[in-house]
Amino acid sequence: MCIRDSIHFGYSIGEKHAGLLVKKINAEDPDLICIAGDIFDNEYEGIKNPKKTAAILRSLKSRYGVYACWGNHDLSEPILAGFTFRNAKKDYDDPRMRNFLESANIRLLDDETVLIDKRFYLTGRKDPSRCRKMSDTRKDPDQLTAYLDKTLPIIFMDHQPGQLDEVAAAGADLDLCGHTHDGQLFPLNIITGLIWENSCGYLKKGTMHNIVTSGAGIWGPNMRTATNSEICSITVHFYPARPNSSDPS
């Protein structure tokens, strides 16, 4: 499976970058593609040719489809010199973003869970920062897993790598995150390591595996000085749960 995060389609990233992503992801021949938020860079108007960009993304190929959750930049806010500012009108919801995903054949999971191939669950969480600005609420991890069959593997997509203990306690086996860009610019790469328990890479939390990707795009200045953009390719093996164990690995 492939996970990508923080593409930030907008003024700096558009159809050319989309084409490169599609080419690299399809080369991995993934069974599942997960986009862990920040598909957009706030101002939808920044995408030069959204119809063409969505058409390019429709070329993504995987056995089980392409799924996404929202990130903190997936709402309408003005941008100046690469940085976002408060929306004075507080009209954060831009329906064009949802329409873009539908046109690109990307299924949004907004505090929702799907059972894939009757073999495993995929849950996409709402982003907490986005919820605060939009006066929305998101479910706790245990609410999202309360009615799931815990003998099947449960995969979470959560843009920000917070609540790792809560997600693990709720029964998730794999937690896919992004948001941090692994700092992107020096010395932010040092600071993110102090803010987040896992700012980039792999961490095992109890029986849960947490993976945080540095992201495929950029935020703010159109550069990276301390980290690399990436598409994260993950190999997952499903094994029958051991007796009296909730760990499927």
Where are these regions (language model features)?
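Soluble catalytic domains of enzymes that build or remodel membrane lipids, polysaccharides, and related
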Residues: R4-N244
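N-terminal low-complexity segments that are often proline-rich with Ser/Thr-Pro
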Residues: M1-I3, P248
